[in-house]
Amino acid sequence: MEENLRIIISGGGTGGHIFPAVSIANAIKEQHPEAEILFVGAEGRMEMQRVPAAGYPIKGLPVAGFDRKNLLKNVSVLFKLVKSQLLARKIIKDFKPHAAVGVGGYASGPTLKMAGMMGIPTLIQEQNSYAGVTNKLLAKKACKICVAYDGMERFFEKDKIILTGNPVRQGLRNHHISREEAIRSFGLDPSKKTILIVGGSLGARTINNCVMEGLDKIKASGAQFIWQTGKIYIGEARAAVAQAGELPMLHVTDFISDMAAAYSAADLIISRAGAGSISEFCLLQKPVILVPSPNVAEDHQTKNALALVNKNAALYIKDAAAKEALLDKAVETVKQPETLKSLSTNIAKLAFTDSANVIAREVFKLADKYRKENGR
């Protein structure tokens, strides 16, 4: 009797890694309901809560990222890396997967490295337009590399690359909420132009500061705003709003659980340039002003943003210029129907509609080949 299909999925750290990982897992289960899926994440990171909430088991590794500013701290990081590799090896030995998938984030390095060394076929998903260091190292042993942008042969062997796009949260693809209903759900006025402000799942200091320091501009704008601050910024955000007086045109929250409603409500979005978020904007045809984070490896968010800007599919403001320009540009743009229409049309051309299923099918091919060769 053939064993159930077993797949390890590793990575996390931010929603930009976790949401695609869960989408891939869901696609695997839809096509193979009997499949057993085990996630491997980093202890203390967001995936340790989000993955179980999505219905999947997860094991944690004590892995941490390298500190590029304080090299002495990396002594403990190296110790954790070695410990994580040994633990990943034990997890793989016990679970006996037929394939392993890496989606980026701290845990994917030791997990995929050990899987490759143990003869397990590996697939990595590179979400950004500029490949990260970990994925560039893992790519040498990977069987397949799923990417979201053209031109990734700069980083990876051409024969391994499959252009799939980035999987997005499942609820976004199947939402049926109208703009009017969505806006009312945030206590706002459907007759007014609405700007959604997000900074990724962890929040964004620069974007939040722009809003807190620009509450007078928001009052006078004639538009209305849905503002997701991130949990660590919500206290000071609410204090700033309370001090500014009555702001009926502003809905502020630390986290939006129903992003389908938030996107439906938005005529324009202000966001960081994480790969997962950009994939969602493309799929939903949303005009966006991107403010790339300067605090990411290889400045990959700027490269993500420019990939859209060069196709007239998004607007772009540097982090350093945001304080002076961001809110003014947003209010100006949301009042220009032709600009919004053009941005929407162009960003829609970059959408991939079935990424998770395409990636799942590649995982099945690797697993099937492994099972035939190993009698499992």
UniProtKB/Swiss-Prot annotation:
Q: What is its EC number?
A: 2.4.1.227
Upper taxonomic classification of the species? Bacteria, Pseudomonadati, Bacteroidota, Bacteroidia, Bacteroidales
Q: Which organism is it from?
A: Phocaeicola vulgatus (strain ATCC 8482 / DSM 1447 / JCM 5826 / CCUG 4940 / NBRC 14291 / NCTC 11154) (Bacteroides vulgatus)
What InterPro entries does UniProt report for this protein, alphabetically? GlcNAc_MurG, Glyco_trans_28_C, GlycoTrans_28_N
**Which residues of the sequence carry a binding annotation for UDP-N-acetyl-alpha-D-glucosamine?**
T14, G15, G16, N128, R169, S201, I256, Q301
Tell me where the transmembrane regions lie.
none
GO MF annotations, alphabetized: UDP-N-acetyl-D-glucosamine:N-acetylmuramoyl-L-alanyl-D-glutamyl-meso-2,6-diaminopimelyl-D-alanyl-D-alanine-diphosphoundecaprenol 4-beta-N-acetylglucosaminlytransferase activity; undecaprenyldiphospho-muramoylpentapeptide beta-N-acetylglucosaminyltransferase activity
**Pfam families found in the cross-reference section:** Glyco_tran_28_C, Glyco_transf_28
Q: Which family does it belong to?
A: Belongs to the glycosyltransferase 28 family. MurG subfamily.
Q: Main role?
A: Cell wall formation. Catalyzes the transfer of a GlcNAc subunit on undecaprenyl-pyrophosphoryl-MurNAc-pentapeptide (lipid intermediate I) to form undecaprenyl-pyrophosphoryl-MurNAc-(pentapeptide)GlcNAc (lipid intermediate II).
HAMAP family assigned? MurG (MF_00033)
What is the name attached to this protein's record? UDP-N-acetylglucosamine--N-acetylmuramyl-(pentapeptide) pyrophosphoryl-undecaprenol N-acetylglucosamine transferase
Protein topology in the membrane: Peripheral membrane protein
At the top level of its lineage, which domain of life is listed?
A: Bacteria
Q: Where in the cell is it found?
A: Cell inner membrane
What gene name is listed for this protein? murG
The reaction(s) catalysed by this protein are: di-trans,octa-cis-undecaprenyl diphospho-N-acetyl-alpha-D-muramoyl-L-alanyl-D-glutamyl-meso-2,6-diaminopimeloyl-D-alanyl-D-alanine + UDP-N-acetyl-alpha-D-glucosamine = di-trans,octa-cis-undecaprenyl diphospho-[N-acetyl-alpha-D-glucosaminyl-(1->4)]-N-acetyl-alpha-D-muramoyl-L-alanyl-D-glutamyl-meso-2,6-diaminopimeloyl-D-alanyl-D-alanine + UDP + H(+)
